Design a protein with these regions (language model features):
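Flavin-dependent oxidoreductase catalytic core characteristic
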Residues: 1-184
Length: 184
């Protein structure tokens, strides 16, 4: 489950960084005279080489539902954090608890359409939590990484919450109206 999660995260981040670099450079960033154009083109194709993000989600969702990462997450949670890192761990623990709730919510539905619709959000949230704990572990080993861990976790919280709210919304309108939306 960790390999497809990692591939999905890395390819999506590569695309976002490349996109942002073009925005930073304005119109000149997309000209062939600059590396930003090549990075953007290469980042877009990386998803195809690695399998689209959706294929990575399909590969990861079974492990997310079956809780394949729980043992590793428990190991990371058992590390002793102090100060800022302890406060960040508490935030991650809260996200993890919500994530387990949302996984159970989807699994208990036994509705394949809802399961498929929420798979990406579940995999993304699993990734936010897992990577957050990894970042804390690394910050524990090297204090220079504390700010990186803090930034990652604080940025992940609203992204996680958005997906969590979507999962828990029990909203079937996209499923119910998919033909009208697709055929529009």
């Amino acid at each position: 489950v960790q390999t497809p999660m990692c591939k999905a995260l890395c390819t999506e981040v590569a695309n976002q960084v490349a996109y942002d670099s073009i925005q930073i450079h304005g119109g000149t960033g997309f000209m062939r005279d600059f590396n930003a154009e090549r990075f953007y083109r290469d980042a877009r194709i990386t998803n195809i080489y690695e399998g689209t993000t959706q294929l990575q989600v399909v590969a990861a969702i079974g492990g997310v539902i079956q809780r394949a990462n729980d043992t590793r997450i428990a190991e990371l949670q058992s590390l002793k954090f102090e100060g800022k890192l302890a406060r960040l761990k508490k935030k991650l623990d809260e996200l993890y608890k919500k994530h387990l709730e949302s996984v159970k919510f989807v699994a208990d539905k036994k509705d394949t359409n809802y399961h498929d619709l929420m798979s990406r959000s579940l995999v993304d949230n699993e990734t936010y939590v897992f990577v957050g704990y990894l970042m804390l572990r690394d910050a524990l080993k090297d204090s220079e990484r504390e700010n990186l861990a803090e930034r990652y976790i604080l940025d992940a919280i609203p992204e996680f919450e958005k997906r969590y709210m979507t999962i828990m919304s029990d909203d079937f309108t996209l499923i119910d109206n998919h033909r009208a939306i697709i055929d529009y």
